[in-house]
């Protein structure tokens, strides 16, 4: 036991039910919380939620219904949502209204179960053309949806590339942030391998009393056991303020 208290699995919804149940039992036995899994099929190359297409809305809501069952099976609270590609045929204001509309419907499905979808803005360098890329945009959407079941997944790696100014943006978005993910830049490996001052970022998050999960959605700078130990030691270095 090296001290990890949570576990993420983006592909959890695609796994066999028997494996989901086994993973849930193992996590429960070890006192590990389930983190995010991706709730739906993401449209990387063509418009989805931004389009306002009713068939695509229905498809998304059906994914959410299925994700609720998965969440209950694996004792998850959070699920990742990415609204998909921008719709170049529509003004951004109309696209935003379309996204808000369907997320309100999804929130109505999630609220009775105490579950939370977290919207993840993704940077334009790695994922060009997506509708949602910046934290203020996600904040505006979550404020408009106005539901405890619709919050922001603030991926520090993505937002360092897209907008920087990390601590001020985290502060401004704080009341709508439900989850964090981690990765340094460049390289998307563990903290201390890039330009982000994770000691200060973590210190700020801790100072706000955050009790949620910090998801390690990054690679290792070295392979094998040596790389795994370097990751652990990196996290020890950046949380020395505690």
Model-predicted regions and their roles:
Residues 1, 18-22, 56-69, 162-171:
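Short, acidic/polar
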Residues 15-26, 89:
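Active-site-adjacent beta->alpha loops and helix N-cap segments on the catalytic face
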Residues 23-43, 99-113, 136-147, 201-204, ...:
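Alpha-helix-loop-beta-strand connector modules within alpha/beta enzyme cores
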Residues 7-9, 34-39, 79-81, 117-119, ...:
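Hydrophobic faces of well-ordered beta-strands that scaffold small-molecule active sites
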Residues 11-13, 40-43, 83-87, 121-125, ...:
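Active-site-proximal loop/turn and secondary-structure-junction residues that shape catalytic pockets
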Residues 49-151, 161:
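Active-site acidic/histidine proton-transfer and metal-coordination neighborhood
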Residues 1-13, 75:
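Catalytic domains of carbohydrate-active enzymes, especially glycoside hydrolases
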């Amino acid at each position: 036991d090296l001290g990890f208290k949570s576990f993420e699995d983006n592909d959890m919804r695609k796994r066999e039910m028997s494996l989901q149940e086994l993973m849930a039992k193992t996590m429960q036995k070890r006192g590990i919380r389930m983190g995010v899994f991706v709730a739906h099929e993401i449209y990387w190359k063509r418009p989805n939620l931004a389009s306002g297409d009713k068939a695509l809305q229905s498809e998304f809501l059906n994914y959410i219904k299925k994700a609720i069952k998965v969440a209950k099976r694996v004792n998850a609270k959070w699920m990742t949502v990415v609204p998909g590609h921008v719709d170049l045929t529509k003004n951004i204001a109309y696209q935003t209204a379309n996204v808000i509309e369907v997320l309100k419907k999804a929130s109505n499905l999630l609220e009775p179960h105490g579950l939370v979808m977290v919207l993840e803005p993704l940077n334009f360098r790695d994922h060009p053309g997506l509708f949602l890329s910046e934290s203020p945009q996600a904040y505006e959407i979550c404020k408009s949806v106005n539901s405890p079941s619709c919050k922001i997944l603030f991926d520090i790696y993505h937002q360092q590339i897209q907008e920087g100014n990390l601590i001020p943006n985290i502060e401004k978005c704080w009341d709508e942030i439900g989850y964090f993910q981690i990765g340094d830049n460049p390289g998307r490996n563990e903290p201390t391998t890039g330009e982000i001052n994770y000691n200060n970022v973590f210190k700020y998050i801790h100072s706000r009393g955050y009790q949620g999960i910090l998801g390690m959605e990054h690679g290792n700078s070295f392979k094998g056991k040596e790389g795994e130990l370097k990751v652990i030691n990196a996290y020890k270095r950046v949380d020395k303020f505690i």
